Each structure stands twice: as structure tokens, then as C-alpha cells.
Amino acid sequence: MKYSTDEIQSLLDKRGEVYIPDGTYIIDRPLIIRSDTHLRLARNAVLRLADHVNCSIMDNEGLYSHETDQNITVEGGIWDGNNENQQRMPIPNEGVPGDINEDMPCDEKLYISNIYIVLMLRFVHTRNLCIKNVTFKNPTSYAIHIADATYFNVENVTLDYDLSNKNMDGVHIQGPACFGRITNVMGNANDDHIALCADGTVRSEITRGVIEDIDIDGVYCSNGYTGVRLLSRGDAVRNVTIKNIHGAFRFHAVSFTHHYRLREDRPILLENIHISDLFISKPTGEIFPPQHASPAKGQPLIWFESDITAKNVSIENVYRAADGADAPTVKVNPRAEIEGLTVRNIVDRSGNGQTFVNEGNVKE
């Protein structure tokens, strides 16, 4: 083992260019990165979370100061969440009758403590953030959580997951966020590979707000969960391009969603969304993890959830392989409202007669 948390932190405190050579480094509390820092890890440098510390590997200073950090780059290395040796605390009353957790913002102290979800990297309140050429290995939940970001770039991300936990997202963007690009996310996740969530829950809503002007280019997986999730519940998600999605998805390639409970004062709006160049299928053969086998088989590849409102959506150049699954390629659920939907050039080899299933209200 090389370095300690203290030694790496002392390098980060100097800001500027910070280089970590090959080796395995055990991290026992969150490393804090500040403005004007370029952290570069060698190809085989491993930052591994220590056993039973139940914390993130890295946070930015702005999470604690509430000030905006600028000009942060994190490049390279293997970020190992060591999930088999971490312990998430259950969210009180989650999933039981009367559960109001999805109607509550997260408590800042609980978010910082990270006890409910053990996020691996957290960047809150940033401008000019770049994360690139990284491998994320076995996080307890989300690999990276970015909230309240302006001008951000996430590129060349490898997900090396054992798929053992729920909520094993890849790149999770929490509103407000604008002017961002996410490209080349490769590997299998056990939740959303990429999520744009204007609003959240007690689990993750450290901030909330509009997400807009985002480009997503490239998701690649052999056993994916949901490729790209768009979520609005009170704030809009708008001006988003999604293209070059390749792979098999247990649930959805792209989903238009919200969180319950629905409230009139939290309208749902997903608008100006352009989706193109998808080469997708449902999984064939045995589905892993096996608990996903039954629900996954019938889930549509492109899905508009009940009670969402969407405007100006285009879907084009979609190829679905002959997967033999009894699941729609595109489905609009009951009570979903779409104003201005363009669908063209869909090649569906599934043979199930469910290329486009409309049970909602679609206005051309």
C-alpha cells in the first residue's frame, strides 16, 4: 500500500497539478478537492475505500462551504468503492404504506454523513468540472453524484460492477445543472447508467432545480439496467440530446419519469428531448441479477411513465435486435401527456408487434 489519506490530502491541499502513481491507496475518509486542482491518477492507481468506513472517496470543498468550486479536473485511475465491506443504513419507513420519503428533500447533515446511500464521489456546487478516463469499481450506490453544476464534462467512464447492490448508478446529475456533456459510459450498472434528475428524494436531493442544455453521447453495455433516465418532479428537464446508446437493457434504454408522490405544486415537464441512433435489445438468456428476470422481461426499451408531461420529443434511427422478448420498443403509459412527438426510422426485429404502444395522450 502507498500513501495514506493524510498524504494524498496534503497534495490536494496544494492545488494545481496533483499526480498519483501506480499503486493501491486505502482511503478512510473523504478526500477533499478544491478549486483550480487537476488530479491525475496513473492507469493502475487504485483508490480503495477502507473497510466499514461507509463514506465517499472524494468530495469537493463546496459541498461543505456552500460556495462554488471552479476548474476541477479528476482524471484516470481506478476508484474502488469496496461495497462488500460497507453498510448502508435503511431509510426509515421506505417502501411501507404512508412512506413520504419521496416527498421530502434530503437533510443536508444526513447527505454529508452519506449513511443512507454511500455515494462514492460527490461534487456539489461546481463550475467547469471535468471527470475523465476513470474506472469505477463496485460502489455501494452511485459512482458519481454531481449537483448544482454549470459547465461540466464527464467522459470515458468504465463501470466495473459486481451488480450486487441496488442503486448502483453510474453518472447521476442532480438539478440544477446546465451546459454539460456526458460521453462514453461503458459497462454494466445496476440502476441508471446516466440519470438527469431535476428533483430527487430524501436519498439524494441535496439541491434541486432545472436541468438544461445537456448532451449525452455513448452508453455501451451487455447487461444494462436503464441507459438514460430523465426525471422531473417540480423542475423541468429540457434541451437534451441523447445518442449512440448500444446494448441490452434489463429495464429501459431511455426513460421519461418522475417521483411519487404526485403534487399539483410540483409539475412534471420534460421538453426538447432529441433521441437518436440507438442499437438496443432486451437481454437474452439468463438475466443477472436473477431478481430482475421477471420485471425486466416486459419493460419497454423507451418508456414514458404515467403522469409525465413531455413536449417536443423526437426519436429516430432506432434498431432493435431480435431478442424474442415480449416487451414494447416504445411505450407511452396511460395518463402520460406528450405534445409534439416525432418517431421515425425504427427497425424492430423483435417480432412481437409492439414497436409503438400508445396508451397515453399524444398530440402531434
Annotated model-derived regions:
Residues 1-364:
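Extracellular/periplasmic carbohydrate-active domains that bind, remodel
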